[in-house]
Design a protein with these regions (language model features):
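Interfacial "coupling" helices/loops that link adjacent transmembrane helices in transporter permeases
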Residues: 6, 10-13, 255-299, 374-377, ...
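Alpha-helical transmembrane segments, especially those used as permease/efflux helices
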Residues: 9-20, 30, 239-242, 255, ...
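Membrane interfacial helix motifs at helix-loop boundaries and amphipathic/re-entrant anchors
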Residues: 34-48, 61-63, 223-253, 308-343, ...
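Small-residue-rich transmembrane alpha-helices
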Residues: 263, 296-326, 339-364, 399-403, ...
Length: 791
C-alpha cells in the first residue's frame, strides 16, 4: 500500500515532467508553425501588375541575400519591347529604384526608395490628390508623410539633399519623380511589369512571356510574385528561422534532460516501493513496463496540452519576433493541422526516451530493498556511469585543446562541444564529486558546530542522489549561460578591437538616421570614404560586396588603391573565382553593364568588403550608391551642416557601432536561448526540490521530536539548498571555463591582438541568484506547510 507521502512525492515528480513536456512541445509547435509560414507578400508598388518578369538570379550563399543581377541596359530595352508586343499586353514597364528619403525622417528600409513615375502604374495604389510630376523639381510622395500638393520638401539622395515641390500624394510608400530624373539616379532594371487589357487571362500572357523570355528571366504571376519581396525581408526571415530552429532543438534536448533527471530521482526515491513489488512477485520487466507506462501517460497529457498551447500562442510569438527584428513587418503565421500532431508525437517520444535509464534502474531493484529504511546511497556511482562520465569529460578536454588552435569557422563548434561534453561528464560524475566538493564548500560550517551545520553537511553527503539530481540542472544552466553570454561578449569586443586596429584615421564620419552618406557629406571630409555597392562576378554571377575608394584609401588601410580599370579583391574571392594578381576579372556592376578590370592586389579577408573599385567607376555605374563611412585623416575636425545627416565620432566608437543591428539581434538571440534554458532549469530545480521535500516529511518530524525549533528546521533546509546551488554553479563554471579560455586563445591567434576574456557578470549573477531563490522557495515554503501540520 502506498503511503500519502509516497503518493505526494510521485505526483510532484509527475508534475515536473508534465510541465517540461508541455513547454517543450509548445515551443516546438510554435517554432514549426512560424518556420513553415511563408509570410511573404507581393510588394505593394508591384502588386498592380498581374504578370512580372524578374532578371535571372545570381549565385547566393547561405545567410547572404542580395538582389538579382540587373539586365544589361540594351538587353532590358529589347526584352521590354518584345514583352510589350505580346497579345493582351497594354504596356511593359521597367521598374527602377534609387535611394530617396525625406529629410528629418527615419523610415523603414523598404520606404527609402524612389522610382520613375511610369512605374507607378505597377502599384496597387494610386494618386490620392494632386497630379503626376512633370518637371525635374516635382515629386509625388506618400501622403502618410504629411505633405500636401504645392509644399516644398527636401529629399535626401545619393548626390545630397535635393529640393522638390510636391505635385501629388499617393496612398502607398515610395517617392516618384519624372522618368528622366529617375534615370540619372537609378541603377539597372531587375523587374519588368506587364499591364494587361481588361479581361485578359494573366495565365495565357504569362505562358507567352515565358516563351519570349526564355532563360533571360523568370515570369511570375499570382502568389509567385512574392519572390519580389525585399531581400532584406528574406534575410530577416532566414535569421528568424535560425533562431527558432536553435530554440526548438534546445527545448527538445533540455526536455529529455529534465524528464530523465526527474524520473531518475523519482525512481531512486521509490526503491522501497519497487522492492515491495518484487517481494510480491513482480518481475523486472513488469517494473520497467510500469515506469514506461507512467512516462507515456505523463508525456501524452503534457504533449497534448503543449500542442494546444503552441497553436494558441503562435500568433503572439510571431508578434514578439517581429518586434525583435527576427521577422519582417506584416508577417503572418499560417496554421497547419499536422504540425501540432507531429509535435504531440515528438513530445511522447521525448518522454519515453528520457525515462529509459530510469526504467532500467527500476528493473534492477532487489526484493530486499523493501526492508530498507535509511536514505543512505551505498552505491551512487555505477561502473557504466563512471566510464561514461570520464569519457565525456575526456572529449571535452580534447575539444578545449582544439578550441585554442582552431580557425574562426571551427571555433564556435568546438567551444560548444567543449561545454556540452564537460557538462555531460560532470553531471554523470556528480555523485562521486559530491562528497569531496561538499566537504570543501561546507568547511566554514565546521567552525559553527551546531546541529543545523552538522545536519546540512551530513544530509548532502549521505543522500548523494538527491544532491546530484538538484545539482545537475543548475550545472547545465550556469555552464551554458556563462558560455553563451561570455563568448558573445568576448567575440564582439575582439571584433571591435580588430576593426579599430585595422584603420589608421583620426575620426570617422557616419550617417545619422540614413542608410549611408551622400556625396555632399563625403565631400566635406578630408580622407577616405567607402562607397558601398554590389558587383556580380564569375560564371554564376555571384554577388560580391564592393566599395568604391579614392586615392586616400592607402592612408587608411595601407593598401594601394585601385585606379582606372583595376580592382583589388580579397584572398577568399580570388581563390573562389581563380583570380590572381595581374589577371583580368569580369564584373557586372549595378547598372547591368559588364567591365573587365585587372587585379592589382589580393588582400586579407579581414577587409570590410570583398572587392574594391575606383570610386568614379562605382559612381558611374551605381548612381544611388551611398558611403557607409568616411574616415578623416587630417587633425582638424570636419564641419558638418545639419542638413547632411552625418556625425563625426571616434574610430573606436564606429568600430563598436558598425554592427550595432547585428549585435542587437545576437544579444536578443542570446537572451532567448538563456531564457529557454533557465526556464527549464526552473522546472527541474523546482520539481526536484519539491519531490525531495515531499519525501522528507519523516526527517522534519524527527528533527522536531529531537528538539529542533521550526526556525532551525527551515534554516537547515535552506542552507542545504544554498550549498547545492553553490556546488552546481561551481561545476557549471568549471565546465564553461575551458571553452572560454580556449576561445580567447584561439581569437588571439586568429586576430593577432591581445584579446581578453570578458565575463558577462550580470548574466552569471542573475542565473545563479535565480536558481538560489527558486530552490530556496521550493524548499522552505513546502516545509513551512509540513511544520504547521505537525503536532
Amino acid at each position: 500500500m502506498i503511503s500519502l507521502a509516497t503518493a505526494r512525492e510521485r505526483w510532484t515528480s509527475f508534475l515536473g515532467c508534465f510541465v517540461a513536456v508541455a513547454l517543450g512541445v509548445a515551443v516546438v509547435t510554435m517554432s514549426a508553425l512560424v518556420l513553415l509560414s511563408d509570410g511573404a507578400k507581393v510588394p505593394e508598388r508591384l502588386a498592380g501588375a498581374p504578370v512580372l518578369v524578374q532578371s535571372p538570379a545570381g549565385t547566393q550563399t547561405g545567410g547572404v541575400f542580395t538582389e538579382n543581377p540587373p539586365w544589361a541596359p540594351q538587353s532590358a530595352e529589347e526584352l521590354r519591347r518584345e514583352l510589350a508586343r505580346l497579345p493582351g499586353v497594354v504596356d511593359a514597364v521597367p521598374d527602377r529604384s534609387f535611394y530617396a528619403q525625406a529629410a528629418d525622417t527615419e523610415q523603414r528600409r523598404g520606404e527609402r526608395q524612389g522610382h520613375p513615375w511610369s512605374a507607378a502604374a505597377l502599384a496597387e495604389y494610386g494618386l490620392s490628390e494632386g497630379r503626376p510630376p512633370v518637371t525635374a523639381d516635382e515629386i509625388v510622395v506618400d501622403r502618410s508623410l504629411g505633405f500636401t500638393p504645392g509644399e516644398p520638401v527636401t529629399v535626401l539622395t545619393a548626390r545630397g539633399p535635393q529640393r522638390f515641390s510636391v505635385s501629388g500624394t499617393m496612398n502607398g510608400p515610395g517617392y516618384y519623380v519624372t522618368d528622366r530624373w529617375a534615370a540619372e539616379l537609378a541603377g539597372g532594371v531587375r523587374t519588368i511589369g506587364l499591364l494587361l487589357e481588361s479581361g485578359t487571362d494573366a495565365t495565357r500572357v504569362a505562358a507567352a512571356a515565358r516563351r519570349a523570355v526564355g532563360g533571360d528571366g523568370t515570369v511570375l504571376t499570382g502568389a509567385s510574385r512574392e519572390a519580389l519581396a525585399p531581400k532584406q525581408d528574406e534575410m530577416t526571415r532566414w535569421i528568424g528561422g535560425q533562431v527558432l530552429t536553435a530554440i526548438a532543438l534546445l527545448s527538445a534536448f533540455v526536455t529529455v534532460f529534465v524528464v530523465s533527471s526527474t524520473f531518475a530521482f523519482a525512481v531512486a526515491g521509490r526503491r522501497r516501493e519497487f522492492g515491495l513489488l518484487r517481494t510480491i512477485g513482480a518481475t523486472p520487466r513488469q517494473l520497467k513496463r510500469l515506469v514506461y507506462g507512467e512516462a507515456l501517460a505523463v508525456g501524452a497529457v503534457g504533449a497534448a496540452a503543449g500542442a494546444l498551447l503552441g497553436v494558441v500562442l503562435a500568433p503572439t510569438m510571431t508578434g514578439v519576433l517581429i518586434d525583435a527584428g527576427f521577422q519582417p513587418a506584416g508577417f503572418e503565421v499560417s496554421l497547419r493541422w499536422w504540425v501540432p500532431v507531429a509535435a504531440f508525437a515528438t513530445g511522447v517520444v521525448v518522454a519515453l526516451v528520457g525515462v529509459g535509464a530510469a526504467s532500467r534502474r527500476a528493473s534492477r531493484v532487489k526484493p530486499l530493498e523493501a526492508m530498507r529504511e535509511a536514505a543512505v546511497d551505498n552505491r551512487p556511482m555505477t561502473r557504466r556511469r563512471r566510464v561514461a562520465g570520464l569519457a565525456a569529460t575526456g572529449v571535452g578536454a580534447v575539444c578545449s585543446v582544439g578550441t585554442a588552435f582552431a580557425g574562426a569557422d571551427a571555433l564556435v563548434l568546438l567551444a560548444l562541444g567543449t561545454a556540452m561534453s564537460l557538462t555531460t561528464g560532470l553531471t554523470l560524475l556528480a555523485p562521486g564529486l559530491v562528497g569531496p566538493v561538499i566537504g570543501a564548500l561546507t568547511r566554514p560550517l565546521a567552525r559553527h558546530p551546531g546541529a543545523p551545520a552538522v545536519l546540512v553537511r551530513e544530509n548532502m553527503i549521505t543522500a548523494v542522489r538527491r544532491t546530484s539530481a538538484t545539482v545537475a540542472p543548475v550545472l547545465a544552466t550556469v555552464a551554458f549561460a556563462v558560455l553563451i553570454t561570455s563568448t558573445v561578449q568576448t567575440t564582439q569586443n575582439a571584433d571591435t578591437a580588430r576593426q579599430a586596429a585595422a584603420v589608421r584615421a583620426e575620426a570617422a564620419v557616419v550617417p545619422r538616421g540614413t542608410p549611408g552618406l551622400s556625396d555632399a557629406a563625403v565631400a566635406r571630409v578630408e580622407g577616405a570614404s567607402l562607397l558601398s555597392t554590389t558587383v556580380y562576378g564569375g560564371d554564376g554571377r555571384a554577388a560580391l560586396s564592393a566599395a568604391g575608394v579614392s586615392s586616400a584609401f592607402e592612408r587608411v588601410y595601407a593598401v594601394p588603391p585601385p585606379q582606372g580599370d583595376t580592382v583589388v579583391v580579397t584572398a577568399a574571392v580570388a581563390a573562389a573565382h581563380g583570380w590572381r594578381k595581374g589577371q583580368v576579372a569580369s564584373l557586372t556592376l549595378e547598372d547591368g553593364r559588364t567591365r573587365r578590370l585587372r587585379v592589382t592586389a589580393v588582400v586579407d579577408d579581414s577587409m570590410p568588403y570583398q572587392v574594391f573599385l575606383p570610386r568614379d567607376v562605382v559612381r558611374d555605374h551605381d548612381p544611388s550608391a551611398l558611403a557607409d563611412v568616411a574616415y578623416r585623416t587630417t587633425p582638424a575636425p570636419t564641419p558638418l551642416p545639419a542638413g547632411l545627416s552625418a556625425d563625426e565620432i571616434s574610430v573606436e566608437a564606429y568600430a563598436a557601432s558598425d554592427d550595432a543591428e547585428e549585435d542587437r539581434l545576437v544579444w536578443i538571440f542570446t537572451l532567448l536561448l538563456v531564457a529557454v534554458s533557465a526556464g527549464y532549469t526552473a522546472i527541474a530545480v523546482a520539481s526536484t526540490v519539491l519531490t525531495a521535500t515531499a519525501g522528507r516529511v519523516r526527517d522534519v518530524r524527527v528533527l522536531r521530536l529531537s528538539g529542533a525549533t521550526p526556525r532551525q528546521v527551515l534554516l537547515t533546509l535552506a542552507a542545504e539548498t544554498c550549498c547545492v546551488v553553490a556546488l552546481g554553479a561551481a561545476l557549471g563554471l568549471a565546465a564553461a571555463a575551458p571553452a572560454l579560455f580556449g576561445t580567447v586563445h584561439g581569437l588571439r591567434e586568429e586576430l593577432g591582438l591581445p584579446v581578453e576574456l570578458s565575463l558577462a557578470w550580470p548574466w552569471l549573477t542573475g542565473v545563479v541568484a535565480g536558481c538560489l531563490l527558486l530552490g530556496t522557495a521550493a524548499t522552505v515554503l513546502p516545509a513551512r506547510v509540513v511544520l504547521r501540520r505537525l503536532p
